[in-house]
């Protein structure tokens, strides 16, 4: 209600009607186009991102609140990227977000992309669309293509031993390939697919191929004396199978087939000389002793 105040000036009665001055309240408003935010002075935000009650919002050139994906550029391009604003509230989203069935990680610098370390765990996000990727991801490396594997459920990068689709792999920054030493054990991984291989594996040596054997169960490289499929072999400390005539650490001589690598017993002819690899002495060449061989 208006309040009347009376003053007597020079014998004339003057009545002043005092009306309270109204002040516009800062608040949200909506019309058939969208939402905007008015300030106390009647103006409103336009073409800028602002903090309102601890939450970030973005307004277009008309002053309407933006929702969904928005590409922002800050500091003359030093910081730029994709940001996401809630389709209902308009507030900028941060952290892990599930959007249209895909996972994203949103930081103050926008949606992460490529290989990322988040709270000590490694993930990979599409370099264009920024959605989290799972499964096998390749990257160029120093000696060819390197492969990483990201868990189909959590998206976390695999490390250490992992069984994937029934095959074993070992990850150390990426899936290992070729001949590898893990701890005090030797293993071999496919040079292309990176899966662990077992059985006989060869590599070029001097003067010819070198052969190694990896246990079918554990995948570990074997060393020392081994019986494989009923035949006897011997491997050095590095896992390489002996071939030809060898003098071993026990001071005895043995003969291993140069092709099959198996220990040969019985009569052996080398450079025109005949030797007897005694099967009763582990295949060692007989020396300085009398034997009855074939009844003779």
Language-model region placement:
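Extracellular adhesion/carbohydrate-binding repeat motifs centered on closely spaced tryptophans
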Residues: 2-296
